[in-house]
Swiss-Prot record:
Gene that produces this protein: MSI1
Cellular localization per UniProt: Nucleus
Name of the molecule in the record: Histone-binding protein MSI1
Keywords associated with the record: Chaperone, Chromatin regulator, Developmental protein, Differentiation, DNA damage, DNA repair, DNA replication, Flowering, Nucleus, Repeat, Repressor, Transcription, Transcription regulation, WD repeat
One of the protein's GO biological processes: flower development
């Protein structure tokens, strides 16, 4: 009986998800300026835009690259991948940025093929938990593997099609962890300085400029203070000696490399009531850091007074796994959760007055809910070149590249009552 009930519940949930998706699809033209949906062969647990952008002459699109990975079934090979994406130019005629009903795509060029192409596959041992490029040289990509080591690849030194023997040949293997994890962060100040956090409760720091032995490097420094899994690590974006970490022990820790003790963070706070899964420092305001948690909330903290949160965002209905600041707008933050939703927040709208009707959609700072995914979102990335464009990947193999409609974030001049409703 129990199994039948479980199956029925699963079927009902699937039906609800499909209904929600149909409603989302129908509303896409009103809520978005761009939606590209691409089915990958395997799910990717990671996505990150690369910083370069080209405009081919005579074309109505720009070309950018992004990093993806695979999470295949047991016997299938895994890859670190590079994809090339065509994005319509802003001044493209509106009929060219048309809505493609069959594919629920908005911002196509009258031709749906070839907008996302996998241009390079590099053999990888096991799934790619996370992949991030080095800011000073985007050819260099670090990956979190399932075997505790962190791999470093220079993708310019690898062929576009992987060797058929399936051999994984990273340019460097970074040692120091005893188990896998997800936390990974390159220093924007010190070329080659890489932080990693894992399930072994440790944070490792490497300098990849050091001389390797047999393509292997041991950690330059290991930081131990978390009591349990280190879920995420991040370098501060203004001070080269500061970084933060969060973990299953519910703590947010701030570390200072100038401190004499590697086991003592300079600041610590119990940030959430459950595991803390992610953190992100604000790129404009040196004091502000955001965290996301299994307790379904996103919180803002001020490094000058870490003991109490500045603000709590509590609209998510499931555990929050990723947070990320808009690289061009100081007050814009995005977060995604287990519940298939990616939310975009505007801090400048906190405590704004609302009508009763608007309040039903969520708090004033909840700017937008992206409802295009039908399973858990694994990762997302703000586009560094195209304002307000986000790419997101989910467990059902879907990669989406999207941009909310301009009138949603530029609505200061709207008459009362004309404010666009939030998507969901």
């Amino acid at each position: 009986m129990g199994k039948d009930e479980e199956e029925m519940r699963g079927e009902i949930e699937e039906r609800l998800i499909n209904e929600e998706y149909k409603i989302w699809k129908k509303n896409t033209p009103f809520l978005y300026d761009l939606v590209i949906t691409h089915a990958l062969e395997w799910p990717s647990l990671t996505v990150e835009w690369l910083p370069d952008r080209e405009e081919p002459s005579g074309k109505d699109y720009s070309v950018q690259k992004m990093i993806l990975g695979t999470h295949t079934s047991e016997s299938e090979p895994n890859y670190l991948m590079l994809a090339q994406v065509q994005l319509p130019l802003d001044d493209t005629e509106s009929e060219a940025r048309q809505y493609d009903d069959d594919r629920s795509e908005f911002g196509g060029f009258g031709c749906a093929t070839g907008k996302v192409q996998i241009i390079q596959q590099i053999n990888h041992d096991g799934e790619v938990n996370r992949a991030r490029y080095m800011p000073q040289n985007p050819f260099i990509i670090a990956t979190k593997t399932v075997n505790a080591e962190v791999y470093v690849f220079d993708y310019s030194k690898h062929p576009s099609k992987p060797p058929l023997d399936g051999a994984c040949n990273p340019d460097l293997k970074l040692r120091g962890h005893s188990s896998e994890g997800y936390g990974l962060s390159w220093s924007k100040f010190k070329q080659g300085h890489l932080l990693s956090g894992s399930d072994d409760a440790q944070i490792c720091l490497w300098d990849i400029n050091a001389t390797p032995k047999n393509k292997s490097l041991d950690a330059q420094q290991i930081f131990k203070a978390h009591e349990g899994v280190v879920e995420d690590v991040a370098w501060h974006l203004r001070h080269e000696y500061l970084f933060g970490s969060v973990g299953d022990d519910q703590y947010l820790l701030i570390w200072d490399l100038r401190s004499p003790s590697a086991s003592k963070p300079v600041q610590s706070v119990v940030a959430h009531s459950m595991e803390v899964n992610c953190l992100a420092f604000n790129p404009f305001n040196e004091w502000v850091v955001a965290t996301g948690s299994t307790d379904k909330t996103v919180k803002l903290f001020d490094l000058r007074k870490l003991s109490t949160a500045l603000h709590t965002f509590d609209s998510h209905k499931e555990e929050v796994f990723q947070v990320g600041w808009n690289p061009k707008n100081e007050t814009i933050l995005a977060s995604c959760c287990l519940g298939r939703r990616l939310m975009v927040w505007d801090l400048s709208r906190i405590d704004e007055e609302q009508t009763v009707e608007d309040a039903e959609d969520g708090p004033p700072e909840l700017l937008f809910i992206h409802g295009g995914h039908t399973s858990k979102i694994s990762d997302f990335s703000w586009n560094p070149c195209e304002d307000w464009v986000i790419s997101s990947v989910a467990e059902d193999n879907i990669l989406q590249i999207w941009q909310m409609a301009e009138n949603i974030y530029h609505d200061e001049d709207d008459a009362p009552g004309e404010e666009p409703s939030k998507a969901s």
